[in-house]
Amino acid sequence: CARRVAVGAVAKGYAAGAVAAALPTGMVLSLGGNVCVTGPKPDGSPWVIGVQNPDGDDTEYVQRLDITSGAVVTSGDYQRYYTVDGVAYHHIIDPDTGWPARHYRSVTVICADSGLADALSTAAFIMDEESGRILLETYGAEALWVYADGSASWTGGCDAYFHS
């Protein structure tokens, strides 16, 4: 019996972090739901990173974040999915059920390391919010959860990033 290891939950984040590490200070690298910031803008101000509204188009945001360095990574159910008999099935599978996780529309994680942010956003997407908060606190990361009804919740440290 052949065994396979799927690294999709961290591969893009790891790759983004590796590329960002080679960039000069003050750059933004965006690979879809993985964004790395290597320092503030040349004028010293933060970069504004949008958290996409899962029900909107690419220009609609649930929140905008002021980021001077680190990673912002989103896992969601609204871009990579297929439809069977009118039911959408996305790619983030809950290992307890074997079916796509249905807690949220998206989870966005903010932390220093892109690979870690990628892994945490996927893990938090599968977990209930309370368990996700405990996991994120362990790694010093922040997160924003978007629910199917459009409501959102976030860790306390996110307030410092919210663009005014």
Residue map of PLM features:
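Mature catalytic core of soluble alpha/beta enzymes
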Residues: C1-S164
